[in-house]
């Protein structure tokens, strides 16, 4: 099963606050430098990488001279705003030493639940990854409400894994993985090396909360693994203090807890699309487009669409039908109904001429398309 780790080409790596700070006294630049060395080595091995970094609140607390994590929301948000500056600067300078560019992206869960913003974020992240840039993602703590209290960077990392269709989510923590009992209280506790993410037995052993600087306990990590599994990603929960942990995972070493999905990525994602979105409009296709979708599993291009029906926005679900009215597929449209009306029947190269811009060359990308 560890071949799923060694063969993974797109990783989302989440690093917790405890692994990025010097015992609560600000960011540990040396530790961050070691993480960067490991991630650069993955890059050089051909791995596409997205980093989800905690640490903004902890860094801000240090700059403000606070020794205890505040409970008041406005104080947490102030600390996050101050700390985010130093956090991003530290990552940028460390990666620059190795000739790598980084990009800061701040997200909230609303950004990923709104379909239009979801597609925008997806396109941006894909472009950055293809350019060899390492996106550094954090939750936008200054504008969220309850999320900041519950260590939701674990959940955010899982949602990002879904967003970029990652093969692997690596959650680095201050524990070696999931155990069958609390190792802090039970010296006989055994590490769970491999399990199915949806195994109900895991709930009984995932109790406990996070440390003083972060709030992400093992329960949030299990929930994150289950979220990632919906799009087919495998998750490794592993100790961040293990020497060369990322390289050793890449090499197939049996470290941490590997939680696997029930389905492969494509099937799980298609099922998620099919079961959670209402249709907002209809695209009537020509015979060539029907064949391209049904037989060749290609994206839907504007040139293959004859008619647009209904009112929909970018990112909403539409039905694709054959000339005789048979439903062929459903998918997330890259363009609104008004935009689609202007570009149907035209080649992708003509989109800019018709609209003045081009969001995507496809009307519906095959990754966002479900055959019925």
From Swiss-Prot:
UniProt-listed SUPFAM superfamilies: Carbamate kinase-like, PUA domain-like
Residues annotated for substrate binding in this entry: 54, 141, 153
S-S bridge residues: none
Molecular function as annotated in GO: ATP binding; glutamate 5-kinase activity; RNA binding
Chain ranges of the PUA domain: 280-358
Entry's EC annotation: 2.7.2.11
Keywords from the UniProt entry: Amino-acid biosynthesis, ATP-binding, Cytoplasm, Kinase, Nucleotide-binding, Proline biosynthesis, Transferase
Residues forming coiled coils: none
Biological process, per Gene Ontology: L-proline biosynthetic process
Functional summary from the UniProt entry: Catalyzes the transfer of a phosphate group to glutamate to form L-glutamate 5-phosphate.
Designated name of the protein: Glutamate 5-kinase
């Amino acid at each position: 099963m560890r071949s799923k780790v060694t063969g993974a080409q797109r990783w989302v790596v989440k690093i917790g606050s405890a692994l990025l700070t010097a015992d609560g006294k600000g960011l540990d630049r040396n530790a961050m430098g070691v993480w960067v060395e490991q991630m650069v080595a993955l890059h050089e091995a051909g791995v596409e990488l997205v980093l989800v970094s905690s640490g903004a609140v902890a860094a801000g607390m240090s700059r403000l001279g606070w020794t205890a994590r505040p409970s008041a929301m406005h104080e947490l948000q102030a600390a996050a705003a101050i700390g985010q500056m130093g956090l991003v600067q530290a990552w940028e300078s460390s990666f620059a030493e190795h000739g790598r560019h980084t990009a800061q992206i701040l997200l909230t869960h609303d950004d990923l639940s709104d379909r239009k913003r979801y597609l925008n974020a997806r396109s941006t992240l894909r472009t950055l990854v293809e350019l060899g840039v390492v996106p550094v993602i954090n939750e936008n703590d200054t504008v969220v409400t309850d999320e900041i209290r519950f260590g939701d960077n674990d959940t955010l990392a899982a949602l990002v894994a879904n967003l970029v269709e990652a093969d692997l989510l690596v959650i680095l923590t201050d524990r070696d993985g999931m155990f069958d009992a609390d190792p802090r209280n039970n010296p006989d506790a055994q590490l769970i090396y491999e399990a199915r993410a949806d195994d109900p037995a895991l709930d009984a052993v995932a109790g406990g909360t996070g440390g003083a600087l972060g709030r992400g306990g093992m329960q949030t990590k299990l929930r994150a693994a289950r979220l990632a599994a919906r799009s087919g990603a495998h998750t490794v929960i592993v100790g961040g203090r293990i020497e060369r942990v990322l390289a050793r995972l890449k090499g197939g070493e049996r470290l941490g807890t590997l939680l696997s999905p029930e389905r492969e990525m494509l099937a799980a994602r298609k099922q998620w699309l099919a079961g959670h979105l209402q249709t907002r409009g209809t695209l009537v296709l020509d015979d060539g487009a029907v064949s391209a979708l049904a037989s060749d599993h290609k994206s839907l291009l504007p040139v293959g669409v004859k008619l647009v029906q209904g009112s929909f926005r970018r990112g909403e679900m539409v039905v694709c039908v054959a000339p005789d009215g048979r439903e062929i597929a459903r998918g997330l449209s890259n363009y609104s109904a008004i935009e689609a009306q202007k570009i149907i029947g035209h080649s992708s190269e003509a989109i800019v001429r018709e609209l003045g811009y081009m969001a995507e060359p496809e009307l519906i990308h095959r990754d966002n398309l479900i055959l019925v």
